[in-house]
């Protein structure tokens, strides 16, 4: 019988969540944080990001939201988990709105690749992934394009050994989307 490969678990920093997850999230996994608007997806992502980010495992937060990262940070600073000392050191925020507005998913992927190569993060967050999906709908064959984008993103993040989180507004578990076919884990908020 072959020996099982041990998967390292990353503590989320969220009280009670690690116990539910069997000790934390699997390292190098590709995860989705989903739920309706206002349910706390971005706050949960930030709490996990600040808990996981370190000089050895930097975090990259790619935002496609309409609001600038500065406004988002202003609200997140109200929480105890927020650590101003990690900003632009262990935690980097990058705005992908310009690329998303082109509707070209290849352009969005190129920018993500460039940022990951430059910063070599151990943890990557894309918020809001639904904005990327909606931007990609301006292309001709949207389903094929989105499926290709998702597969490429999942393969690249895995090869770079980055634990990845896609944050998205989904209203029901049955919302059809290619993201569900590549996600290793799903955290559904209500």
Tell me the role of every PLM-derived stretch.
Residues 65-70, 97-102, 129-132, 164, ...:
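Conserved nucleotide-binding/hydrolysis micro-motifs of P-loop NTPases
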Residues 32, 123-125, 165:
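Structural motif
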Residues 97-158:
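Phosphate-binding/switch loop-helix module in NTP-utilizing enzymes
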Residues 12-24:
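Pre-Walker A adenine-sensing motif
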Residues 1-4:
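Charged, amphipathic alpha-helical linker segments immediately N-terminal to NTP-binding catalytic cores
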Residues 151-158, 162-190:
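Phosphate-binding/switch region of NTP-binding enzymes
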Residues 31, 36-102:
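Conserved P-loop
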